[in-house]
């Protein structure tokens, strides 16, 4: 696990984009993408770039259960607004949060991941150490699954909604086992509120109580953090 410290989120996005360009030069064709505030500066760099992404496939980590793609709180909407509208891809995959059978939807998504192995996976990290929507206690062997969101996650995400009552209580998330199959993982974290999770992820122990700690076992992880998020690493 390599740690890169940056001044701020803008610099972090630039470095993540440089890593992406290197990966593309080596033949990467499938990107695993994340939502939330952490990757926004990275997507801004992609949008500003003259690079053409129309031969690439993207697979997103997760989607809320119960939100239509037209809801401005859905992750499908987030990705279109922050990246896909400006930079079309060959194909974009996100879980269908309105699927009538969400367990079957999770299995369908696993098949998509199997058919499109992820070359470059972008991650954020939750205050409780979750990656994707894999909450503490999630099995490291889990693939795509339906998640009951913890109160801490609902509270953290409530800033994107009118009220905390509007935050969906479930999501469909790529599993930890699926994430670990990615060839390369770039995790971005900014702000003091991420410091505890970053410390636990880097120094262990490796435990399902802190899902991101499993990344210690991956062969190619780069963690991009500002000084606040890295404040407990010294």
Curated annotation (Swiss-Prot):
EC number: 3.5.99.6
Entry-linked Gene3D superfamilies: 3.40.50.1360
One Pfam family from the record: Glucosamine_iso
PROSITE patterns: GLC_GALNAC_ISOMERASE
Top-level EC class as recorded in UniProt: hydrolase
Function: Catalyzes the reversible isomerization-deamination of glucosamine 6-phosphate (GlcN6P) to form fructose 6-phosphate (Fru6P) and ammonium ion.
Similarity remark: Belongs to the glucosamine/galactosamine-6-phosphate isomerase family. NagB subfamily.
Record protein name field: Glucosamine-6-phosphate deaminase
């Amino acid at each position: 696990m390599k740690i890169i410290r940056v001044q701020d989120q803008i610099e972090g996005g630039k470095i993540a984009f440089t890593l992406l360009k290197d990966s593309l030069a080596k033949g990467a064709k499938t990107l695993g993408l994340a939502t939330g505030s952490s990757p926004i500066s990275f997507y801004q760099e992609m949008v500003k770039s003259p690079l053409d992404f129309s031969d690439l496939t993207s697979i997103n980590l997760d989607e809320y259960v119960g939100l239509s793609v037209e809801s401005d709180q859905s992750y499908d909407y987030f990705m279109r607004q922050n990246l896909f509208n400006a930079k079309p891809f060959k194909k974009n995959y996100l879980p269908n949060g309105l699927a009538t059978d969400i367990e079957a939807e999770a299995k369908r998504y696993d098949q998509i991941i199997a058919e499109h192995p992820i070359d470059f996976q972008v991650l954020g990290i939750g205050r409780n150490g979750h990656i994707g929507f894999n909450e503490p206690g999630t099995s490291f062997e889990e693939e795509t699954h339906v998640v009951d969101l913890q109160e801490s996650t609902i509270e953290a995400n409530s800033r994107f909604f009118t009220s905390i009552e509007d935050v969906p209580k479930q999501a469909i998330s790529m599993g930890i086992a699926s994430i670990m199959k990615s060839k390369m993982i770039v995790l971005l974290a900014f702000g003091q509120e991420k410091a505890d999770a970053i410390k636990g992820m880097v120094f262990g122990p490796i435990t399902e109580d802190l899902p991101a700690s499993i990344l210690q076992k991956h062969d190619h992880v780069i963690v991009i953090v500002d000084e606040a998020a890295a404040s407990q690493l010294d």
